[in-house]
Amino acid sequence: MAIKALSYIGVNSDKFEDWSDYSQKNLGMQQVDRGKDILSFRMDDQKQRLTITGDKGDNLGFLGWEVEKKEDLSFFASKLEKNKIEVHQAKSSFADMRFVEDLIYFDDPQGNRIELAYNPMSDTDPFKPGRPISGFKTGALGMGHAVVHVKKSMI
């Protein structure tokens, strides 16, 4: 039972132009979706790595962690519930929105939304970086790292 990689990140922000510019020109991401309330980006063959929700706040919306096996979702849900953390099973329509086969979600003690996802979808179209880039490796390694600030009393 293992968490394999940081699969995707969601940010609450209504500054779509700023995020579009920054993600493509600075991070080299490919913008893949733009709607009234959502902005999405790729950084490899995975369908979606970064989502801007359109909600006000300019803060973390969610962190999505990939698990190795579908059974890992039940394993982690059980562990969390034993520690009195409320876990939710996502409906298939919600999993589709995240481009994963299945997922559970919960809030950490600081109130950050954490999602554990199984089998992220790949895109059949090749990744097209937003700027010239080389040596860009993600894939099975995921997005990299995430640092989440917590109150000192939480440590």
Where are these regions (language model features)?
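A structural feature that tracks compact, well-ordered secondary-structure segments
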Residues: Y22, M29-V32, T51-D55, F62-E66, ...
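Core segments of cupin and vicinal oxygen chelate
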Residues: M1-Q48, H149-I155
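Short helix-capping and inter-helix turn/linker motifs at the boundaries of alpha-helical repeat units
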Residues: M1, G54, F136-K137
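Active-site beta-strand termini and strand-to-loop segments that position acidic
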Residues: F41-Q46, D55, F106-P109
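Vicinal oxygen chelate
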Residues: A5-K15, D55-K152
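Short acidic/glycine-enriched loop/turn segments that link adjacent beta-strands
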Residues: G35-I38, N59, M97-V100
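Short amphipathic beta-strand starts and helix->beta connectors
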Residues: Q46-L50, P129-R131
